[in-house]
A protein has these predicted regions:
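Beta-propeller domains with acidic blade repeats across secreted/periplasmic ectodomains
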Residues: 1-173
């Protein structure tokens, strides 16, 4: 019964295909629903993962989150109470929790004509709450921790995606 009844781990994942489509590689997994991802200027991948609304209020609820998707990473999402605790040695922590919402578009500010702090930020769009967050990354060990900032918000503003134009402007829908 319920969401994903009988579904097996690893649930959401990111896969890489060769240009000819003959080879594929499972890059990282353990997401609930990795809606979008982007690459920073160093080629590191960051994934915006969705929450499971049915779990809200339960001890195993996981909010929407930004994950630093290093090769072979596992983020531990499983249905219901089966989620891996964040202290498992082979489960990577998220960069930042966003909270309840509907993740959609994500992009880095690289190429904008914004102040430097915002050029380095990753931008996350939330459809439900009409909010775009700027997440400022700080190195922590081999990964990052993020500090979120409300960048654009309005009701109604059902955001869907964000892009950076050749003119240095940010565009969003």
């Amino acid at each position: 019964y319920g969401h994903n009844a009988g579904g097996k781990a690893p649930a959401g994942f990111v896969m890489k295909f060769s240009p000819d489509g003959k080879r594929r590689e499972l890059m990282h997994m353990g997401y609930r629903n990795p809606v979008d991802f982007c690459l920073n200027r160093h080629g590191e991948m960051f994934v915006y993962d969705a929450d499971m609304e049915w779990d809200m209020g339960s001890p195993w609820y996981r909010p929407t989150r930004l994950c630093h998707a290093v090769s072979g990473s596992e983020f531990g999402w499983r249905s219901g109470t089966g989620k891996w605790p964040t202290w498992y040695a082979d489960s990577l922590p998220q960069v930042v929790d966003i909270g309840p919402g509907s993740p959609v578009g994500v992009n880095f500010g690289t190429g904008t004509k914004f102040p430097e702090k915002y050029q380095r930020a990753v931008y996350l769009c939330d459809w439900t709450f009409g909010t775009m967050y700027a997440v400022h990354l700080q190195p922590r060990g081999a990964s990052y921790v993020g500090i979120r900032e409300e960048f654009v918000a309005r009701a109604p503003l059902p955001l869907t995606d964000v892009a950076i134009g050749d003119d240095g402007a940010m565009y969003f829908t």
